[in-house]
Structures are given as structure tokens and as C-alpha cells.
UniProtKB/Swiss-Prot annotation:
UniProt key word Cytoplasm: yes
Alphabetic keyword roster: Cytoplasm, Transferase
Protein name, UniProt field: Sulfurtransferase TusD homolog
Gene behind the chain: tusD
One GO process term, biological-process aspect: tRNA wobble position uridine thiolation
A GO MF term: sulfur carrier activity
PANTHER family: PROTEIN YCHN, SULFURTRANSFERASE TUSD
Transmembrane segments: none
Lineage: Bacteria, Pseudomonadati, Pseudomonadota, Gammaproteobacteria, Pseudomonadales
Length: 131
């Protein structure tokens, strides 16, 4: 089965941890993830500036490792990211900000990428965003 995964909640939320575990289990079960899409507060999971407490699970590092190990397509919504200060080098320069906190393996792109992923996957599975 082909999955598209969308994460709407920040790294410290239960939904973010469930999204990671679901993704790991799907891959371990031989399924395909066509795209990971980070939207709303989920964009913080891609930020290099998130620091987890010493006794806490480092979810952003776990996402990065999963994406790199499996060669996954990991897209961060550009509009949501900009509003939350999650910038790659190009956007930091464009807006005159002192530094970027988003790099490989993440890609900034638009909401159309979520739509495209949903169309090419058998299932779109969303985590969080139920406030």
C-alpha cells in the first residue's frame, strides 16, 4: 500500500510521535510512503533549531534519520514554515533573516504537494490538527 503522511502538530505532541511510529511501521511492513508533508505547527519537526530536553525523545532528529535512511520525500509547507520562522537559506536571504534553520533532507514547497501526494497514494493519513 502507498501512504501519504501529513503532520499538523508540533514535535512535542503525541500526534507527532504517532506519525513517526506509523511511518516506521508502514516501512517495516513493506509499504511505501510517497510523501511526508509537514503543515501548520508540524513544520517545527523539520527545524534544526528544536532542542529536546536531555531526558526527552528528540523527534526532529528521529524524523531526519528516517527520511535520510529511507530516501523519503519530505516536504514542509512554505507558507506555514515562513509564518513560524522555519526558513531555508534561500528564504532567509530573501527576507533578510540572519540564518536558516531548514536544510536537507527537507524541501520547502506549496500545499499542492499535499494534494499531489494524496492523489498518488492509496491512503492519506493525517496526524494532529484537530483543535
Amino acid at each position: 500500500m502507498k501512504f501519504a503522511i501529513a503532520l499538523f502538530d508540533p514535535p512535542h505532541s503525541p500526534a507527532a510521535r504517532r506519525a513517526l511510529r506509523f511511518s516506521e511501521a508502514a516501512l517495516a511492513g513493506g509499504h511505501e510512503i510517497v510523501r511526508l508533508f509537514f503543515y501548520q505547527d508540524g513544520v517545527h519537526s523539520a527545524s534544526a533549531n528544536v532542542v529536546s530536553g536531555q531526558d526527552e525523545f528528540d523527534l526532529p532528529a528521529a524524523w531526519r534519520e528516517l527520511v535520510e535512511r529511507n530516501g523519503l520525500d519530505a516536504v514542509v509547507c512554505i507558507a506555514a514554515a515562513l509564518r513560524r520562522g522555519v526558513l531555508n537559506a534561500e528564504e532567509a536571504e530573501r527576507y533578510g533573516r540572519p540564518g536558516a534553520n531548514l536544510g536537507a533532507p527537507w524541501e520547502l514547497s506549496g500545499l499542492g504537494q499535499l494534494h499531489e501526494a494524496a492523489q498518488s497514494a492509496d491512503r492519506l493519513v493525517c496526524f494532529g490538527g484537530d483543535r
